[in-house]
């Protein structure tokens, strides 16, 4: 286990079981409020997880009580001008860093995922939630709008009409509604959240890592890049993965046959 500063840790399996499985753990009791320091530590953790050769899949976890209640509002209220702009940028950079981890990622959601906490969960590839979790795009209740590319991520999953309703109202909604909207991929008993997320991630531990990274980048690029740029990047990744496979790194026909 390599501790990162005060609130964020990277925990990697010791190899006796689930070799390649890692956890990005946010631990800032009681609510895992996301301050500028927490965001900076998330960026560092995501960068480490992306670089480490002993990591094949990542679980994003806030502990067994709560995922995150969102931004540190007392801190935000003290910011002015340039400080607020810096805070918005570091939030976006943290969310982007998690989304850019070039490995399969699963958010294990307990308790509450509110505001920026919901956005952080949406940065993972998949989300497993306890059946008692409360969700909400709650920034409007503080007179704010969601940041960190939250509006795009929420709209992508729930559609424009539903995203507007959730953001404009700031209301809480339960795991059953989140599942119906596609915001989570599986709903389990509260005590089973981490184990269910690990089971989800475990399916990819022995997969071809270069190909998985290329496939993830390709899917994400559908939403993020203009068509011409996206197709050029897709072709480049295909050639890179094919070349790696010619060296014995891939076990399947690159044409899918």
From Swiss-Prot:
Q: Does the keyword Lipid metabolism apply?
A: yes
> PANTHER family recorded for this chain?
(7AS)-7A-METHYL-1,5-DIOXO-2,3,5,6,7,7A-HEXAHYDRO-1H-INDENE-CARBOXYL-COA HYDROLASE, ENOYL-COA HYDRATASE-RELATED
Matching CDD domains: crotonase-like
Biological process according to GO: fatty acid beta-oxidation
Question: Could you read off the lineage of the organism from its UniProt record?
Answer: Bacteria, Bacillati, Actinomycetota, Actinomycetes, Mycobacteriales
From the UniProt record, list the reaction(s) this protein catalyses.
Answer: a (3S)-3-hydroxyacyl-CoA = a (2E)-enoyl-CoA + H2O; a 4-saturated-(3S)-3-hydroxyacyl-CoA = a (3E)-enoyl-CoA + H2O
Name of protein: Probable enoyl-CoA hydratase echA17
According to the UniProt record, what class of enzyme is this?
lyase
Q: Where is this site: Important for catalytic activity?
A: 139
Q: Which family does it belong to?
A: Belongs to the enoyl-CoA hydratase/isomerase family.
Supply the alphabetized keyword list. Answer: Fatty acid metabolism, Lipid metabolism, Lyase
What EC number(s) are associated with this protein in UniProt? Answer: 4.2.1.17
Pfam families (UniProt xref): ECH_1
Q: Name one GO molecular function term.
A: enoyl-CoA hydratase activity
Q: What does this protein do, in the record's words? A: Could possibly oxidize fatty acids using specific components.
InterPro entries per the UniProt record, alphabetical: ClpP/crotonase-like_dom_sf (IPR029045), Enoyl-CoA_hydra/iso (IPR001753), Enoyl-CoA_hydra_C (IPR014748)
